[in-house]
Amino acid sequence: MAKKKVVTQIKLQCPAGKATPAPPIGPALGPHGVSAPQFVQQFNDRTKSMEPGLVIPVVITVYADKSFTFILKTPPASVLIKKACKIEKGSATSVTAKVGKLSKAALEEIAKTKMPDINANDIEAAKKIIAGTARSMGVEVER
């Protein structure tokens, strides 16, 4: 089996189970000759078991024959933190104004979820990375 020639990689963030060929997906795929409706249908099929609307990063590899493959990543840490704290958005002034509190259990749960995609060797290092993200969003982290 001959190896296909990779033309490009496209990185997108799409809502799980609710992706449509409308912007930003269509305009990102169109110039590379990839069928947006075909990608959307495959993406929605693979993400239908996830929470609807949860933002999922996806890396699409486009080949010379206009075919494609894609890899689903874990949701961004900021999205998981906002969901755990039940807040709409982070603080504009993260040092002075705190918008929520993240428990130890929630921190560990988020770290376990992010472990495959995060640059950490163990769960403790992952927890520190997630805690740093939370602090930069104005979320207080329980010690």
Curated annotation (Swiss-Prot):
Function, in words: Forms part of the ribosomal stalk which helps the ribosome interact with GTP-bound translation factors.
Keywords, alphabetical: Methylation, Ribonucleoprotein, Ribosomal protein, RNA-binding, rRNA-binding
Protein name from the UniProt record: Large ribosomal subunit protein uL11
Organism: Treponema denticola (strain ATCC 35405 / DSM 14222 / CIP 103919 / JCM 8153 / KCTC 15104)
Family membership noted in the UniProt record: Belongs to the universal ribosomal protein uL11 family.
Gene3D superfamilies: Ribosomal protein L11, C-terminal domain, Ribosomal protein L11/L12, N-terminal domain
Modification after translation: One or more lysine residues are methylated.
InterPro entries from the UniProt entry: Ribosomal_uL11, Ribosomal_uL11_bac-typ, Ribosomal_uL11_C, Ribosomal_uL11_C_sf, Ribosomal_uL11_CS, Ribosomal_uL11_N, Ribosomal_uL11_N_sf
